[in-house]
Amino acid sequence: MARVKRGVTSHAKHKKVLKAAKGYYGRRKNTIRIAKQAVEKGLQYAYRDRKNKKRTFRALWIQRLNAAVREHGLTYSRFINALAQSGIEVDRKALSELAIHEPAAFAAVVAKAKSALPKAA
């Protein structure tokens, strides 16, 4: 039986790693051992930040909503409470987009939510 040498497979693996390390700085782009470590670390960052992206965007929407709602004399927390009481089920992403691109429609939503709040004595 013929002897199997692993030159072809190892070359393919190296090529795959170097392709993934394209654009890296210094020896990270052309030295196999260092490139492999850099690519693995990059994949770890990518995995972690795919999770963090959801948190980051939610925080952004909340900041935008807080700023937009304060123009109408409410705070973010009171606005969200008012939305729940009035039965309006629109997510924060849609509300922030509405506040940016359709201020009149957002003002109507705020007015509807305000009407659900109990009057302060």
UniProtKB/Swiss-Prot annotation:
SUPFAM superfamilies: Ribosomal protein L20. One of its GO terms (molecular function) is rRNA binding. GO terms for cellular component: ribonucleoprotein complex; ribosome. Keywords: Ribonucleoprotein, Ribosomal protein, RNA-binding, rRNA-binding. The keyword Ribosomal protein applies. Gene3D superfamilies: 6.10.160.10, Ribosomal protein L20. Binds directly to 23S ribosomal RNA and is necessary for the in vitro assembly process of the 50S ribosomal subunit. It is not involved in the protein synthesizing functions of that subunit. This is Large ribosomal subunit protein bL20. It comes from Methylorubrum extorquens (strain CM4 / NCIMB 13688). The lineage of its organism: Bacteria, Pseudomonadati, Pseudomonadota, Alphaproteobacteria, Hyphomicrobiales.
